Regions:
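Alpha-helical promoter-recognition and RNA polymerase-docking modules of transcription initiation factors
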Residues: 1-94
Length: 94
């Protein structure tokens, strides 16, 4: 993927990116941008479980992997917001 295409993807709306990704699940550039744009969700959810005896870094790592799993499974045609779809997946993995 060239730099110009990646810049174009970074400027796109999240819904547009999910439409592109749902058409082509092998598009690594779009997948990476979606992950970067939603890492805050993994960070917020992992912070909620910080004082439960597990290191924050471990919680964040598990939450990040669950986020990637949720991005791969998300179906935009169902009409749900991504955060509503991903939150139970991430919390379940934590």
């Amino acid at each position: 993927m060239n730099l110009i295409t990646e810049k174009k993807y970074e400027e796109m709306d999240v819904k547009e990116l999910f439409k592109i990704f749902s058409d082509d699940k092998t598009n690594a550039a779009v997948r990476n941008i979606l992950i970067e744009k939603h890492l805050y969700l993994a960070k917020i959810l992992s912070r909620k479980y910080m004082n439960k005896g597990v290191d924050y870094e471990d919680l964040y790592q598990v939450a990040s992997l669950a986020l990637i799993y949720a991005i791969d499974r998300y179906d935009i045609s169902k009409g749900f917001e991504f955060s509503s779809f991903a939150t139970p997946t991430i919390v379940g993995e934590i």
